[in-house]
Amino acid sequence: MKILALEFSSPQRSVAIVQSGAFHEALGSNEPFAMIAEALREAKLEREQLDCIAVGLGPGSYTGIRSAISIAQGWQLARPIPLLGVSSAEIIAAQAQAGGLVGRVRVIVDAQRGEFYLAGYELTANGSREAEPLRIVSAAAVTQRASAGETLIGPEVTDWFPTGKTIFPRAAILGQLALGRTDFISGDKMEPIYLRETQFVKAPPPRQLG
């Protein structure tokens, strides 16, 4: 299977073509379609030869994730192609495991408003497994875990917690996670992972005059 992977949830955006375990990756903050063209060129593939598009759904940069989803949606409208969505927290954990990290880790991503997304993963020589579901916690809760010696990983995590390990989610790992998966989704159902409720103010009832 030839997979186009788009991971735009962090400041270090990446695009990759993954096929048969090999990958060709473009990193940086370049224009997305230029990065896609670079990855296709390195893989010696045409757009029409792709079998699937995988998208990192966050949590992370809402604008970046929306951009990746829009590209996947537009691609599917132009030419029917299966789409896959993968949690960026899962990508970070898998990347840490591929880098040799083992044991229990907590993936930490900035959720703004003084809060953080947190998910726990168990890393072994055979892979990574979710041990704590993703949720939003206070900065104090993360500080308490750091003080207890827990391993914190994530993009820019050391900006807040100096003992953490900075790991950006990469499209190459996303593509490898997508290999063999069949939980495809239609473009109109693909949404960023965003655990907050939508904030809105209900309009007051109209005043009666007279």
Task: Give the predicted meaning of each segment.
Residues 1, 36-62:
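N-terminal glycine/serine-rich phosphate-binding loop of ATP-dependent small-molecule kinases
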Residues 1-34, 45, 84-210:
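Oxyanion-binding and handling regions
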Residues 52-83, 88:
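DPxDG-like acidic metal-binding loop motif
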